[in-house]
Amino acid sequence: MLKGVVINKGITPATDLAPSEILTEENCVVILDEKNKKIYLWRGRSAGISDKFKAARLAHQLNWKLFGGAALVIQRKDVIKKQLNTYPKIDAEISKSVIRSILG
């Protein structure tokens, strides 16, 4: 089960969206795969600096908070697209309370 959020001038749940819909150069995306202990960190080339910072902070803090730093944080765009294209959609959002505790 994948959980995710899109960060683009705010934080939006990625629930029921296909990875191809959200992995754009304008967005930053954090997708959590708890079963496989992977966190996908997508930072679009045209995304704002603030959004890139928030996405990176969220991904790395989720790693420590949920996995004690043991999860694999994947940032290579080609790897992200290849691995996530096997999933039809994002199943759920990352809890707002967890995001709030990390980003404030």
Predicted region positions:
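Long, low-complexity regulatory segments enriched in Ser/Thr/Pro/Gly and acidic residues
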Residues: 1-104
